[in-house]
Amino acid sequence: MAMPGKSSHAPSRLLLALLTLILLALPARPEPLAAPDAALAQALFGADGPVVLDRRETPVPGWGVSRDGRMLGVIGSTWEIAATTGYSGKPLDVLVAVTPQGVIAGARLVRQTEPVLSLGISEAHIAAYVDGFRGVDLSQGEGQGRALPDVISRATVSTGVIRDGILRSARVLAQAQGLGGGGIDRVGYRPATWADLLAEGAFGHALVSMADAARAFAGAKVPVEPSDAPFLDLYAGLIDPPTVGRNLLGAQDFTAAAGALQPGQALVAVLSRGLYSPRGTEWRRSGRFERIAFEQGALRIEPDDGDFVMVEKLALPDAPAFKEISLFRLNIDPLAGGIDPRRPFDLVVTATRPLAAGDEAALPIRATIRLPEAYAVAEAPAVPLWQEFWLKKIPGIAVVAAMLFVLALILFGQEALVRRPMLWRRVRLGFLATTLVVLGWGLNGQLSVVQVVAFLNALLSGFRWETFLIEPIIFLIWSAVALGLLFWGRGVFCGWLCPFGALQELANAAAQRLGVRQIAVPQALHERLWVIKYTLFVAIVALSFYSMEQALILAEVEPFKTVISMRFLRAWPFVLFALAVLAGGLFIERFYCRYLCPLGAGLAIPAKLKIFDWLRRRPQCGRECRLCETKCTVGAIDPLGRINPNECVLCLRCQVVMNDPGTCPVLKRRARSAAPTGDAP
């Protein structure tokens, strides 16, 4: 059982309260939007002269880019469109340029605060990766056309988020420009009759009788004679789907009409019979069809003679004998002020007659056009990025799962293990070597205080599980650490799953085998040095709410990225610092863990909440014997024999000492007392 004495809960409670106050006092701040300038737009589209940018808010926020009146495409922000958030919890913003044909013209990373990208990967390497999306044709399926650039191996999470943001935003921008026919199926075909097309909702219908018109034009100079005959029997619909257009017009006429369409255009058929003519005759002189308009919300488009296609007859034998058959090319590029064909819109034919009083009476006749579901193209649901990464890393996931299973066996069966010193040592060193080589250098499974900061910032700026699921190895380890904190405290990670901690312990074990003399730090100094790591943790967290960039610089006090993630492939100051820390660990076991590690300090804060307290103590500990104190891996046992849960890394060394009859002085005395003395000769 734990030794009685002065409680060490106060520092943890104070730090926890301080962090809570920081979180409550800092409201979420809206992130500023990065906007392109003309020079950047010109570079992204490869224009040979000045371009004009036009900010647009609907239907997709972005900037239209044109040159000499010709639309080059649109630029969008991945942060504004897809809310791309990096592992730092802050925006990862890329400006993406997409042509009307659905091709990515270029991309430029304009804002990021990722630790690896900021201080681990060269700007040229990042720029080359982002530029690798140039030329990707979004109209082609996955696996077709130009291959996507591979994520950067040392920054899989950050570059994976960049890739996902570019592709998602580019698809949205392309669809808004009419890619894929504005969501219209332009490929599928099956024979259909006029009755079939009406039953499917391919045409909107409006019928105004002569009697209805007579009432609407009461008082006209030339009155309308009321009757049941049609004043206007109107049908209108999108005929781009071959099932509609080819059956309606015949293969030859449909091919000719569809082939004349420009990107961002669709064909609308206006079919009518009755007294009133939707086209009229004025358009031949004015060039505009003043009687006809297409409306969607506040948007109104009046076609002109350049949009008009004359059709003499329909190919459907069961269609009514229409008096007028007209086709109009309709702008369906919402970014260029067009109709969105995926939403209902109206064909409005306005009939007018002069009144005897001198004014003019108007009768608007509406036929609502809807694209039937049968003719809509549903975008294939993209596999979420995090699922893609999990599928790719199944072998690594299996390795981590196996390690966690073995660790669970060790911790749940620790009483049996600690009674076998040689077995414990082999298991301990073997597991640490696996943690370093396989989990650390092999799978890049090193946790960092940056991830804690990212989590806290995400709670304030909009938490998304997808961001943290992108890296399955890190997610699994953090899940295990969370459970470990609940059951046993920080030692699950610090003592067993931290690659850098494993490197320190293995290096110190080798140093001791080589006879390197160890430095015993006085207890008073030892405890005061703890202040450094707790101060660093609070400073990094607090600074991140002010400036993530500066917080990441301070977080370089962790040599994890240099040693584990980057494998010493960094600038010499980082390598020199890492080597200095490791050198200190040769003389003081786990020197960095004891005094400098901000992540360990952060994990120590909730250590008092653990459920299990399976580390045994005896009344003699600290009073009659201090062997466990001198052998403790991180100096977590004080002179009174108490184990400080904030510092303990759960290495089980003290339990091995306590249960070894050949090592523990208490057990030795008991053995001597129990030994038979024999009779004197």
UniProtKB/Swiss-Prot annotation:
Position of the signal peptide: 1-30
Membrane topology field: Multi-pass membrane protein
Any GO MF annotation of the entry: DNA binding
Any Pfam family hit: Fer4_5
GO cellular component: plasma membrane
Annotated compartments: Cell membrane
Main location: membrane
One example of a Gene Ontology biological process annotation: positive regulation of DNA-templated transcription
Domain of life: Bacteria
Listed InterPro entries: 4Fe4S_Fe-S-bd (IPR017896), FMN-bd (IPR007329), NosR (IPR011399), NosR_regulator (IPR052378)
Keywords, comma-separated and alphabetical: Cell membrane, Membrane, Signal, Transmembrane, Transmembrane helix
PANTHER family attached to this UniProt entry: ELECTRON TRANSPORT PROTEIN, ELECTRON TRANSPORT PROTEIN YCCM-RELATED
Family: To P.stutzeri NosR.
Protein name as it appears in the record: Protein NirI
Protein encoded by which gene: nirI
